[in-house]
């Protein structure tokens, strides 16, 4: 799964730590999501999308083979 979390954070000048605290996960989890090593749960994806006021499908896209 591809995501645009890093881009969304940069747009609002938010750190990984700030995002992690806002959605209730560790900074390491945000790092892993941004680097494609962890696929967030539906609930976590919705929390992140809501925080950035963007549709989930704008932040997360399926890749071939997903």
Which residues fall in each region the model found?
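Residues in the helix-turn-helix
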Residues: 18, 29, 58
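Short, charged recognition helix plus adjacent turn
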Residues: 50, 61-66
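Recognition helix of helix-turn-helix/homeodomain-like DNA-binding domains
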Residues: 25-38
